[in-house]
């Protein structure tokens, strides 16, 4: 959603690191609910999503946390990637998220990490974790205005360097 905290974080990251990488966004809400029965059917949104991931050099998932987990739409999107040609297989992958809560999106990131390491996905997830921003109403407001403190920029930079080597 374009007004969500995590969408704003994703936009910030794409602007901040535009000289190191090209970022492409995909609206996963356009994907139909996953069903193995639909794998044989042609679906332009699913095909475009799978092709985008397949052609990407790396993938960054920016996720909120709902009920201590990942949003259903993201899990649905990952189901579409769990079949040939296995677009996430050994693909450099990072997780990021922002939240107003004390733990940020840590539980969602842990859950997403487990899913991304599943045998059908086997993404090359950054081993030292992703980028997590928590308890930070003022910090989020600054990020939304592109006035982030140095430690936030350095933290994001050290996480994203994984992709730019």
Language model region names:
Residues 41-120:
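Helix-loop-strand module that forms the ligand-binding subsite of alpha/beta enzymes
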Residues 6, 10, 46, 74, ...:
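A general structural signal for well-ordered alpha-helical segments in protein cores
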Residues 18-24, 122:
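A generic structural motif
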Residues 2-5, 34, 69-70, 104-105:
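Secondary-structure boundary/capping motif
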Residues 28-44, 139:
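N-terminal beta-loop-helix "entrance" segment that forms/cooperates
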Residues 1-20:
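N-terminal beta1-alpha1 ligand-phosphate binding loop
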Residues 124-165:
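Glycine-rich phosphate/pyrophosphate-binding loop and the adjoining helix
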Residues 24-26, 94-96, 126, 131:
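Hydrophobic/aromatic beta-strand patches that form the interior of the parallel beta-sheet core
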